[in-house]
From Swiss-Prot:
Sequence positions that bind Mg(2+): 455, 457, 459
Gene Ontology BP term (one): DNA-templated transcription
Organism taxonomic ancestry: Bacteria, Bacillati, Bacillota, Clostridia, Eubacteriales
Residues reported to bind Zn(2+) 2: 780, 853, 860, 863
Cofactor dependence: Mg(2+); Zn(2+)
Pfam families: RNA_pol_Rpb1_1, RNA_pol_Rpb1_2, RNA_pol_Rpb1_3, RNA_pol_Rpb1_4, RNA_pol_Rpb1_5
Subunit-level organization: The RNAP catalytic core consists of 2 alpha, 1 beta, 1 beta' and 1 omega subunit. When a sigma factor is associated with the core the holoenzyme is formed, which can initiate transcription.
Task of the protein: DNA-dependent RNA polymerase catalyzes the transcription of DNA into RNA using the four ribonucleoside triphosphates as substrates.
EC number: 2.7.7.6
Residues binding Zn(2+) 1: 66, 68, 81, 84
Full protein name: DNA-directed RNA polymerase subunit beta'
Length: 1161
């Protein structure tokens, strides 16, 4: 019997290899052969000997106890019982000990025979169909032709085989089943085959060349990995440990068992039957049938349903095979390795906690007691309330009064993590200091709701307790809500006042002409506030106040009160504070005063906002919604214009299409005029108007529908209906109007449901493609950069140059073109002020970018620039790839939810949104593709046989002709001068064409601009660098065109860096370098083409990825985050980087810590 195995220490290895298992290897892993299909004895409920749960093979079911009961207790550790043969050890070895089944006939492994492409078929140069005929005993295959006229590997039917037998006797050999294939595979000389294929490659072309390349790939894989081809045929089947395919007793004496046990049972039964038949010397046809059934049983065990009908259990449910255990959302990878359930956690409904400070959360008492139970028990013993842990536990369970005092002490300074699903970005998990509260609901600070996207209509949140000192330190320094004030996607504050707080601040800072006390002068702030408290002056009255520096300041009393919470470095805010203004105040405060001052400011605004929105006593009544008097006249005018247009159409002056467009235009203008009239007629202190203009709730569109007119609507197909809804909600809709409205509303809801799922899937793909992008280098020393200017959509500027420069590094120092003074240096990050100065004098600037970074795995600090979540230069080890993916994916869900609130009013509905982003990132051929010019030159347009053709004539008189498909609209005119890559027709450009014409830089700039366009049109700001990270990952690979003297295969995809390395070696040796062209991969393809097979397998197409990796004997270097999470190592980012591994964290006593608050993280 083998000795105790040492458990693998996760942190002790830095790469992981996968390969094919040889029969000897499988026997080495095994602790014994499983010979019987029995599982457990139904009377004694003990495992049957030599069965699938045998204790002799897999270890004892109870700790330190053998099967027959002769040896019990730990003192017999390691003894093998002489009666039952069971080793006395822990029962958990049943999770790791494997068994095996010796097969009476070899069978093929379905992954290698049936996968696409069939690896077995490629090696033997047979089609999968003929391979199937041989393996499943339909045809014979000639394994040795001897001196006959037969060919090796020729297929023969039963009758043909008999004829040849009669004709040639035993001069040739032919057989069927996996044995025949095994013989052929054993005979293979890979080196010889490799040379033959390389010669063939040079001679053939077309389909045959592609096939040769494919075969060569497989041959090389086997040659380099040390795997043998015959290992694809199995003589031995491994049996996984019984704890991984458990059998549990249900109440009522029945048993529930894993499907794998059924599948193993079928294999064992058929194998035993086959052995018996062979011993009896049964006729060939019976043996053959049994062998085929054994082959099918093993297929079902490995991958049920891959070939033929799946084996089903009760109720016609297909059984879950080994492959199914790994695949999909419920498979081993995604369910258990990438997402685990943890203890020390709880969940509850959330309610608002308006009195909390930004870094606090309210934790219900009973929940806190349960979460911190071990800490409380330890403290009770330490303080002498209990003698031992057991009595302390009893005290906690009985909830004695002293327990609460101890709990109070335990939770001070011990942060907890709060998480709300769905966690769309890193702000979905933040740390807070718990405050004990009565009741059973978690209390949440109102300002972190935006980050969590939480509201209080019944949302729930989960609480987790960081246990170790390290975890607590990270929670406090990195995850505390007061440190997460900025949004990583654009660097704007995410914790900024909303709703009531905005309304309160807006009301407080408004001015009311002619209010009580207007024009009074006060000697200082307190006197002014006193006048308000004693009702001598109104809150919104314009007054003058003497400043400490002696100046007279004209302001309102409300603004004086408001400024009492604004830190002095921000200055005096003497304007109406709506949502935008508040946002800017917070951003400025963070820039000038850091997160500490900002947290205080936010809490101050929160208190004031709530207080004064209550004081304001905002209500909404019917009288507040006043319909403007001009409305009737505006509608009458519009009706008149529509009638005129109809007349023109009837006379045949305009087409139906023109008429439709004109009518739509008339009504759109009418709606706008009504809206303007409405805004004009509303009182500035009208509660509805205040709510909309302050940005607290609602918008002008919704106001228009309440008091103006609803306007034009879309029908279910998205076409605008030319009959507008003239009424508003105040007046009420007619039946027809109501019916028209229902289309839009329904479409909004359906869209939301569908697109939320799409957005989630997009985020998942983005994370997967970029998860190994980490800041690994200080400076990569690149000499290339990208040229940036304003991003435009037609004439409109979507993103200004200034915004694109902030927080980046210049490629080289930049001087003022006239004065020659240095505007910014290449060694320092560009500040907001510098960016402003540069944009004043330059239209285009070259900056360092992730796109041109030369760091091999990841990016360097200089090319990345500022970390937007902190506002400082990015740290080493920051997982910028994940942040980028979250920053693009999280607003994706917002793109999806936008259509909902406007009730489907035409013109606001977007089809551009998410599908377009997906199309770009997947590098798909776009719908409505534009034709682009492949060369620079002048345009000439002509008609040929009723079709338009565009010629582009270059300066060297070269003429390129493009045929314009029917129905496309031209974008160029006769005589226009255009550049390569310019569009000739309207539509979206195919990025692959762009890559051919304009090269890598061109396609990078195009993708960046297009993605930005979609998001900006939705009003979502995302920083360029996040999109750059994705685009870089899409262009990581090159396709080898000619191999030269390298070992690369033509047509193979290879990483740019590997390609350059290979070429450098060959050139140094005086050989011919390989030639490759860049390829653009969609994010799904790029994720699957990653070096890490663990990451790819856990993403999609698990079996295909593992099949390929096993044949190649791939080594996973464990550089990304995902692979490390899967095997349970610390991730190589942040504090998990190797350079921080040996940092020790200790808990100090209170006295030793003087003042930690003054230390900036």
């Amino acid at each position: 019997m083998k000795g105790e195995r040492t458990v693998l220490d996760v942190n002790n290895f830095d790469r992981m290899r996968i390969g094919l298992a040889s029969p000897t290897m499988i026997r080495e892993w095994s602790h014994g052969e499983v010979r019987k299909p029995e599982t457990i004895n139904y009377r004694t409920l003990k495992p049957e000997r030599e069965g699938l749960f045998c204790e002799k093979i897999f270890g004892p079911t109870r700790d330190w106890e053998c099967h027959c009961g002769k040896y019990k207790r730990v003192r017999y550790k390691g003894i093998v019982c002489d009666r039952c043969g069971v080793e006395v050890t822990r029962s958990k070895v049943r999770r790791e000990r494997m068994g095996h089944i010796e097969l009476a006939a070899p069978v093929s492994h379905i992954w290698y025979f049936k996968g696409i492409p069939s690896r077995m078929g490629l090696l033997l140069d047979m089609s999968p169909r003929s391979l199937e005929k041989v393996l499943y005993f339909v045809s014979y295959i000639v394994t040795d032709a001897g001196d006959t006229s037969l060919m090796k590997k020729q297929l023969l039917t039963e009758t043909e085989y008999r004829e040849y037998r009669d004709k040639y006797g035993s001069r040739f050999k032919a057989s069927m089943g996996a044995e025949a294939i095994k013989m052929l595979l054993e005979e293979m000389d890979l080196d010889k085959l490799n040379d033959e294929l390389r010669v063939e490659l040079k001679e053939v072309s077309g389909q045959r060349k592609i096939r040769a390349i494919r075969r060569l790939e497989v041959v090389e894989a086997f040659k380099e990995s040390g795997n043998r081809p015959e290992w694809m045929i199995m003589d031995v089947v491994p049996v996984i440990p019984p704890e991984l395919r458990p059998m549990v007793q249900l109440d009522g004496g029945r048993f529930a068992t894993s499907d794998l046990n059924d599948l193993y049972r079928r294999v064992i039964n058929r194998n035993n039957r086959l052995k018996r038949l062979l011993d009896l010397g049964a006729p060939d046809i019976i043996v053959r049938n049994e062998k085929r059934m054994l082959q099918e049983a093993v297929d079902a065990l490995i991958d049920n349903g891959r070939r033929g009908r799946p084996v089903t259990g009760p109720g016609n449910r297909p059984l879950k095979s080994l492959s199914d255990m790994l695949k999909g959302k419920q498979g081993r990878f995604r369910q258990n390795l990438l997402g685990k359930r943890v203890d020390y956690s709880g969940r509850s409904v959330i309610v608002v906690g308006p009195n909390l400070r930004l870094h606090q959360c309210g934790l219900p008492k009973e929940m806190a007691l349960e979460l911190f139970k071990p800490f409380v028990m330890k403290k009770l013993v330490k303080e002498g309330h209990a003698h031992n842990i057991k009595s302390a536990k009893r005290m906690v369970e009985r909830v004695r009064s002293e327990v609460w005092d101890v709990l109070e002490e335990v939770i001070t300074e011990h942060p907890v993590l709060l998480n709300r699903a769905p966690t769309l970005h890193r702000l979905g998990i933040q740390a807070f200091e718990p405050v004990l509260v009565e009741g059973r609901a978690l209390q949440i600070h109102p300002l972190v709701c935006t980050a969590y996207n939480a509201d209080f209509d019944g949302d729930q949140m989960a609480v987790h307790v960081p246990l170790s000192a390290e975890a607590q330190a990270e929670a406090r320094l990195l995850m505390l809500s007061a440190h997460n004030i900025l949004n990583p996607k654009d660097g704007r504050p995410v914790a900024s006042p909303t709703q009531d707080m905005v309304l309160g601040s807006y009301y407080l800072t408004m001015e009311r002409p002619g209010a009580l006390g207007e024009g009074k002068i006060f000697k200082n702030r307190d006197e002014a506030v006193l006048a308000y408290d004693t009702k001598q002056a109104n809150l919104q009255a314009m007054i003058k106040v003497r400043q400490p520096n002696g100046e007279l300041l004209e302001t309102t009393i409300g603004r004086l009160i408001f400024n009492s919470v604004i830190p002095p470095e921000v200055g005096y805010i003497n304007e109406v504070a709506g949502k935008k203004a508040l946002n800017n105040i917070v951003a400025k405060c963070y820039r000038l005063g850091g997160y500490k001052a900002t947290a205080q400011l936010l809490d101050g605004i929160k208190s004031l906002g709530f207080k004064y929105s209550t004081r304001a006593g905002m209500t909404v009544g019917l009288a507040d919604i006043t319909v403007p008097e001009e409305k009737r006249q505006i509608l009458a005018d519009a009706d008149g214009m529509v009638n005129k247009t109809e007349q023109q159409f009837r006379r045949g002056l305009i087409t139906d299409e023109e008429r439709y467009e004109k009518v739509i235009d008339i009504w759109t203008k009418a709606t706008d005029t009504v809206t303007k009239a409405l805004m004009h007629s509303l009182d500035k202190f009208n509660p509805v108007y205040m709510m909309a203009t302050s940005g607290a709730r609602g918008n002008i569109q919704q106001l228009r529908q309440l008091a103006g007119m609803r306007g034009l609507m879309a029908d279910p197909s998205g076409r605008t209906i030319e009959l507008p809804i003239k009424a508003n909600f105040r007046e009420g809709l007619t039946v027809l109007e109501y019916f028209i409205s229902s289309h839009g509303a329904r479409k909004g809801l359906a869209d939301t449901a569908l697109r939320t799922a799409d957005s989630g899937y997009l985020t998942r793909r983005l994370v997967d493609v970029s998860q190994d992008v980490i800041v690994r280098d200080e400076d990569c020393g690149t000499t290339q950069g990208i040229m940036v200017d304003d991003v435009k959509d037609g004439p409109e500027v979507i993103e200004k140059l200034e915004e694109r420069l902030v927080g980046r590094f210049l490629l080289e120092d930049l001087k003022h073109p006239e004065t020659g003074e240095i505007l910014a240096t290449a060694d320092n990050e560009i500040t907001e002020e510098q960016a402003h100065d540069i944009a004043e004098v330059y239209d285009k600037v070259t900056i360092r970018s992730v796109l041109t970074c030369k760091t091999r795995y990841g990016v360097c600090r200089k090319c990345y620039g500022r970390n937007l979540a902190t506002g400082h230069h990015v740290e080493m080890g920051e997982a910028v790839g994940i942040i980028a993916a979250q920053s693009i994916g999280e607003p994706g869900t917002q793109l999806t939810m936008r259509t909902f609130h406007t009730g489907g009013v035409a013109g606001d509905d977007i089809t551009q949104g998410l599908p377009r982003v997906e199309e770009l990132f997947e590098a798909r051929k776009p719908k409505g593709q534009a034709i682009i010019s492949e060369n620079d030159g002048v345009v000439a347009i002509r008609e040929v046989k009723g079709r338009r053709e565009v010629d582009v004539i270059s300066d060297t008189e070269e003429r390129m002709t493009y045929t314009i498909p029917y129905g496309s609209r031209l974008k160029v005119r006769e005589g226009h001068r255009i550049e390569a890559g310019d569009e000739l027709t309207e539509g979206s450009i195919n990025p692959h064409d762009m890559l051919k014409v304009k090269g890598i830089r061109g396609v990078q700039v195009y993708l960046l601009g297009e993605v930005q366009r979609v998001y900006r049109l939705q009003g979502v700001d995302i920083n360029d660098k996040h999109i750059e990270v994705m685009v870089r990952q899409m262009l990581r690979k090159v396709k080898v065109e000619e191999a030269g003297d390298t070992t690369l295969l033509p047509g193979g995809l290879i990483d740019v860096f590997d390609f350059e390395e290979e070429n450098t070696k060959v050139i140094a040796a005086g050989g011919e370098p390989a030639v490759a062209r860049p390829v653009l991969l969609g994010i799904t393809k790029a994720s699957l083409a990653t070096d890490s097979f663990l990451s790819a397998a856990s993403f999609q197409e698990t079996t295909r990825v593992l099949t390929e990796a096993a044949i190649k004997g791939k080594v996973d270097p464990l550089l990304g985050l995902k692979e490390n999470v899967i095997i349970g190592k610390l991730i190589p980012a942040g504090t998990g980087m190797s350079r921080y591994r040996n940092v020790k964290v200790i808990n100090l006593d209170e006295e030793q810590v003087e003042n930690l608050d003054s230390v900036n993280p």
